[in-house]
Each structure stands twice: as structure tokens, then as C-alpha cells.
Regions:
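N-terminal leader/linker segments that precede catalytic domains of diphosphate-processing enzymes
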Residues: 1-246
Length: 246
């Protein structure tokens, strides 16, 4: 099989042959990527908008959502995003999908998280990389396109509900939690609203943190409302990330 890259000169290593007696060219010629089942990769973008001259608080923020016109989660609201092309870097995917679905382009975008639970998509194994951007609301024009039935700014409000401390939870660190480690659970309600579109929904998300110096952090959707898949968890993580910087 032809190598995926035309120029693979930086992959020679020491130039020695492998145990099968193959040099790099021979190895690539026989390598069959179809032999292994592999995940698909997507990006999703959390685009926040603020009013006024600067973004000083998470209060009053809006988030850009698209309405899905096809399965899965048809009719629900989602973050703009989609599948990465084979010869496209993830940053390029995030910008392309954002422009195709909403018409928004030219933003500074930061990669904030990866979501890879095996059961997050019924079509196939899909791992998504989440991006975040913040813009003045009047600086961009939103117009739905591609497979988005609609694209709008939505009011978003995050409310902390409760905090729980647990010890020796076997879910943390794959069941190898030290007696000294604590597991903290933070419960949130995410309210998303757009009056003109008849959208008024609430999601419940749990943030779990294990460890201190090295932290294992997860965001899990307990109740999705009308927000597709795990996108409410991604939005909550983005809001909390932004809140730390304001």
C-alpha cells in the first residue's frame, strides 16, 4: 500500500531494519491501515459572545449553537463542528466546520479538551476535540449552512448546585486510588435559552476531579435537555475554563 505521506524522510530513525528485515519503504509498502478498526475524529467549537467593550465576566455570555437537521440527535441544538478530513490539521477542521455551519470565521481559537467515551455516537467510535473562542457579539455575522438547520446565539447561564467529597471511588484512576486521594464532584445546571427559536432547556452536568498535583478531570452529562450528545458538558468545561481567567 502506498504510504500516507509523500515525504516521510523524518521517520527513518536510525535507518536500521525491523525484525522482519524491512526498511521503512518496505514496511510502508506492506502496511495495511484497513487491518485495524480505527476511530473517527471530529472537532466542536464553543463560541462565546459578549456585549460591550470587553469580556469581564461569564454573566451575560451567549453561546453559538446550531440546530441539527439530520441524525443523530435530529432537531436538538449542538456546537458547530464535524469530521476531520484525512489531510487536515485539527485547527483547520475546527475553523472550516465553524465557517461552513455558521458563516463565522477568522477567530482566535483555543483547544480546551478531548471527549472520547466510546458510546458518545451511535454511528461509529467518534473522538472529538473541543475548541473555544470569545468574540464581541456585534463583530460576527451568523448564518446557518451545510447540515445545520439553524444557527443562533443563545443565552447561557451556569449554576453550581452542590459539591460532594468522596474517598476511594474505584472509578477514579481506573480503580487504583490512593487512600490519600480525594474525589470531588461538582454538580451544575446549565440553562440555555433563545426566545425567538422557542428554545428553553436545562442540562445537568457533573464535574469529577481526582488528585491534586496531577489531576484527573471528567465532565459527565446527567441530563441533556435539548442539547445534543455531550455538548452540554463541553460548554460547562469551557465556561469554567473562561471563568478562571476573568
Amino acid at each position: 500500500m502506498t504510504a500516507f505521506l509523500n515525504d516521510f524522510s523524518k521517520f527513518y530513525g536510525t535507518g536500521e531494519k525491523n525484525e522482519a528485515g524491512q526498511n521503512l519503504e518496505e514496511f510502508l509498502e506492506l502496511y495495511d491501515s484497513r487491518k485495524y478498526e480505527t476511530p473517527s475524529n471530529t472537532t466542536d467549537a464553543v463560541i462565546f459572545a459578549y456585549e460591550g467593550e470587553s469580556c469581564d465576566s461569564i454573566d451575560g455570555l451567549k453561546v453559538l449553537l446550531v440546530k441539527r437537521s439530520n441524525h443523530p440527535s435530529i432537531g436538538y441544538w449542538a456546537l458547530p463542528g464535524g469530521f476531520a478530513n484525512m489531510r487536515e490539521n485539527l485547527d483547520e477542521t475546527a475553523r472550516r466546520e465553524l465557517e461552513e455551519e455558521t458563516g463565522v470565521k477568522g477567530l482566535v481559537m483555543e483547544q480546551i479538551a478531548t471527549y472520547g467515551d466510546y458510546d458518545r455516537d451511535p454511528r461509529t467510535r467518534v473522538i472529538t476535540t473541543a475548541y473555544m473562542a470569545v468574540v464581541p457579539e456585534n463583530a460576527v455575522k451568523v448564518q446557518a449552512g451545510d447540515d445545520a438547520a439553524d444557527a443562533v446565539w443563545c443565552e447561557v447561564n451556569l449554576q453550581g448546585v452542590s459539591t460532594e467529597e468522596r474517598e476511594n471511588d474505584l472509578k477514579c484512576y481506573g480503580g487504583a486510588v490512593s487512600d490519600l486521594e480525594k474525589q470531588m464532584e461538582y454538580h451544575y445546571k446549565l440553562h440555555v435559552k433563545n426566545v425567538s427559536r422557542g428554545l428553553d432547556t436545562e442540562a445537568e452536568v457533573v464535574q469529577t476531579i481526582c488528585g491534586e498535583l496531577v489531576r484527573e478531570e471528567h465532565f459527565q452529562v446527567e441530563k441533556a435537555g435539548e442539547i445534543a450528545v455531550d455538548h452540554s458538558a463541553i460548554i460547562v468545561q469551557a465556561i469554567l475554563t473562561l471563568k478562571k481567567r476573568l
